[in-house]
Amino acid sequence: MARGARRAPDCGVREVYSLRREWRLGAWLAPALGFFCGCEPSVPESVPAPLRASDVAQPAGWADELAMPSTPDLNPDPNVLEIELEARVADVELLPGLKTPAWTYNGTVPGPMLKAKIGDRVIVHFKNSLPEPTTIHWHGLRVPNDMDGAPGITQTPIESGGSFRYEYTLTDAGTYWYHPHLDSSTQVGRGLYGAFVVEDPADTKTFGDELVLLLSDMGLDEDGQLLPADTGGSFGDLFGREGGTVLVNGKVHPTLKVRNGKQQRWRIINATRARYYNLRLRNHRFVRLGGDNGLAARSEDVYNLIVTPGERADAVFTPADAPGTHNVLRWVPTERGYGSTFNRSAEEMLYIDTVADAPVTPEPIPAELRTIERLDVTNATQRTLELTIAIASSVEMGVNGVPYWKTKPIETTLGATEVWRIVNNTDFSHPFHLHGYFFQVQDAARVLEWKDTVNVPTKSELTLAVRFDDRPGAWMYHCHILDHAEAGMMGTLLVRDPASAAADLPAPMHNH
């Protein structure tokens, strides 16, 4: 099997380094409008040709390992995870033999994988050595309000050369990740992200060999250099920017060695700005265990895993290929609006080599995984949030027709249960993310689970139930296509504690 893969072009939107992200009608939108008219999109001559893995020399027997970077725990207490994180520019090898000046945590892409358990106290001594301000958002973790990393909402941006101490106690098992929340599309696109796994010591279930797969992409030229933010020009711009180089744990086409019959539990994280992953493995099915916030109520058999930006999936597969056989994990373009599958084909991501037979018979995966009580919404407050896009001289996105910098916060009370109807009448799908709280999708056809990020397909709606049980304060909600959020598709939720003095909501910043 040839180990070169066809790659999608790097998609770009004009980058404006200001508090408000402007999406102007220019070269980037013209190809999109051409597509609507039935014309084939053209790419400006100044746009570098997308780099293909086959263009890079690969040594004989080349196979990257999937080991994630780590960082020392500075605290001897087994119930405390204390680390140092530094955001800095560093040369990293993302493509064989080439150095990329990426934006990194502790000098690696991805950043160090963090692992702890429910009840642990986490202390992060963070230093910002980037040339611009930043923060860290602990995506999915239910942390105290002032630890959430939302600039201008929960904390002041950390200036270049500055530092901040993040400290919180872990309350929920699951697969999480961390990333910036200031100029986030650019900073994430340059390499700032890392995985965070929280385990439940009381959960004795095992599902074979466990592996975290952090999926990302970056825009790189033929020399491994980061492409400028505004070198796009394909129809993909309105879907958000996708880097043309797809990475698994910071590697291009790594190889995983497995044993026939030995179960593999994959914790999958979509750390991209905009790319939807529809994952398939030839002649195999997955058993989905859950996703964002730990195990679902029950397992389900699926033949593909769709993981949208910011979302996570927890799944098991049992290798069934004979020793000496090679398989490939592919992502398949998935329909998420006009032209989302136009001129795109399946791409190889991860090579899987079966090297031996497992000595044991795979354990059956239970149908029932854990008990989850469905939220009682009998007296819940009902809200409707419509995700909107307006195109005139610029592209302005918002919620209920209002961009973030013009919107007023939603206000609720600590202890309240609410039902949110998320309406998407736009021509593009949007992954909806809520900070600070978990929700349940109100759909009898879905497996019951706790989530913080969910896809709202184009021309559809979803109903979510959420209980604001603790941690009062101001929290964000937004589309997790990061360019969409920065174009205005986000809002603020203010959870007030009746027992405390009313807090003033900070004025919203325009670039997150």
Give the ranges of each region predicted by the language model.
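Hydrophobic or amphipathic alpha-helical targeting/insertion segments
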Residues: 43, 162, 166-203
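Asparagine-centered strand-capping/turn motif at beta-strand->loop junctions
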Residues: 126-130, 268-272, 422-426
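Mature N-terminal segment immediately following signal peptide/propeptide cleavage
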Residues: 73-102
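N-terminal edge beta-strand
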Residues: 92-118, 243-257, 392-417
